[in-house]
Amino acid sequence: MEAGEHELVVEIPYNSKVNIEAMFLLGEFSVKVVGRDQVLDAVSHKAAFSDLTAQGYPFYGGNMTYKIPFISNGGEVNVRANLFRAPVIKAAVDGKEAGYIAFSPYEVSLGELSKGEHLLELTVFGNRVNTFGTLHNCDQKEDWYGPNAWRTTGDLWAYEYQVKPSGLL
């Protein structure tokens, strides 16, 4: 696809008793969401320790792996991730799985490491909250997802996307 404005038209029968399911546009691109508008852009293949929804992945529901080179002094090494929005994080060092981070104290042992350079890989497992979730529900305290959570009205509804933070924050 060339850079510029494009229009994708999908026609389906729709009424108040039918819901539209999420549709996926797959490819090597990022998405910037500002209010109601979305713009596709080049993907960076890099992510900071910050909300992934603001880094080009507002609707992404898959896994994301952070690759972090580090130098060890040798000996027992632990990794802790106490500020994240994901179901679970898988930790690996130098290609060897070390364990999972999901519950307090949000820490996993990488084992005894030799002195020198190593590669830590933290795979943050995705979820579908920003793909299938209540993206127009303005109730920030809503923690239940069921049939009527998608049917908001009045001040609880917004045309602008209400994405939830994700990733290593």
Summary of predicted features, one role per range:
Residues 2-4, 75, 109, 114-116:
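A glycine-anchored, Pro-Gly-centered beta-turn/N-cap motif
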Residues 8, 70-94, 101, 120-122:
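Aromatic-lined ligand-binding clefts that engage carbohydrates, nucleic acids, or primary amines
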Residues 13-42, 125-169:
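Glycine/proline-rich low-complexity spacer/linker segments in large multi-domain proteins
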Residues 38-69:
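Edge strands and adjacent loops of beta-rich recognition modules
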Residues 66-68, 104-108:
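Short strand-edge motifs at loop-to-beta-strand transitions and within beta-strands
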Residues 113, 122-123:
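Ligand-binding pocket scaffold of soluble enzyme catalytic domains
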